Amino acid sequence: NGDGASGTWTSTANAYKHILNVSITDISSAASYWVVAPVAGNIVGYSCVIDGVLITGDATLTLEVGGTLVGSSGMTVAFTGSAAGTVDTVATTATAVTAGQAIEVITDGLSTNVVRAQISIEMDVS
């Protein structure tokens, strides 16, 4: 990674990271949302940011690839203290995906209030 002359090194820490984004119209409604993996790699985590306040109950998100759960459990977006801009993140055990494979984001519909959310799925494509 050095330039050969100055001895300066460039970090490659994120060189093999690819982020997929999924927009959810209402995290409080039970539904499935889909995104296609453009390259082969491993899902290593995902994050959610909400655009409002959840009321009554927590929202749970899960990811599936080919009907198999990504990681050991889903992500809980707590209604207590929720507000626009609240971010939740889950690290997962690496789940392999192939280029062109569908990734499903599932909402459980157990919270109330119409709240949009943005999901970012982190892939390691090294």
Question: Predicted segment positions?
Answer:
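Short beta-strand-plus-loop segments that form exposed binding edges in beta-rich domains
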Residues: 105-112
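Short, surface-exposed tryptophan/glycine-enriched loops
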Residues: 85-99
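Ser/Thr- and Asn-enriched, surface-exposed coil loops between beta-strands
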Residues: 40, 81-86
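Glycine-rich, low-complexity segments
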Residues: 1-30, 51, 58-60, 64, ...
